[in-house]
Amino acid sequence: TLKSRGQSVAGLSERNEWDWYLEKNKLDLKKLDDKCWPAALKDLDKKQLKPIFSTDFVRQRAEIAWGRGKARVVVEAALDLGKVVAGDNQEEICELELELRQGDAAALLELAAELAADLPLMPCDISKAERGYRLFDPNSYEVDPPAQKLLAETPLDGAFAAIAWYLLGSSQRLAEQYRFNGHWRLLEDWLQHLQDLRTLLGSLGQAVPRA
């Protein structure tokens, strides 16, 4: 599988993926052609590519379909159980992926909220690859997601959404890093982000013009 970086905020991801079935456990460079290979890496010698981590997991799939108003919604649920290995280090994989196959994206969030009400789930936008890079080089992990630049002419609802997405995404990455290494400062920063997010949501009623 070749995955582009795409966009991922607070567990909701949009990206391109290419899948191939290989007969051998070896990278087939012929598959990495111009149809999928990033233009920015066109001068890279693919023969120099070497594995620095591996993922070994079992995936169980199920299709969930229901009616939402007059529209049909289809979601593929995939449960991944296994591990990421980089040298002598390894990390367990226990992920539930929800992929929207048909319908409105809002339905995907509604399903996730219903599942989280009964199961110990937490949104997370950290990929298996990012876990592998972190095992190989702990300094490669970025706690703060890229912040959107706000301008004076940015609409109020756009500014509110940008700040909320940043705080939500950053808080989840802090929680994930705290789970990984247990540094108390990360816990303190995580709680502060949650407080900032709560304050932001509380100020919404004051910022929205009244009719």
Regions found by a protein language model. Give the residues of each.
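Phosphate-end processing signature that detects enzymes handling 5′-triphosphorylated RNA
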Residues: T1-A211
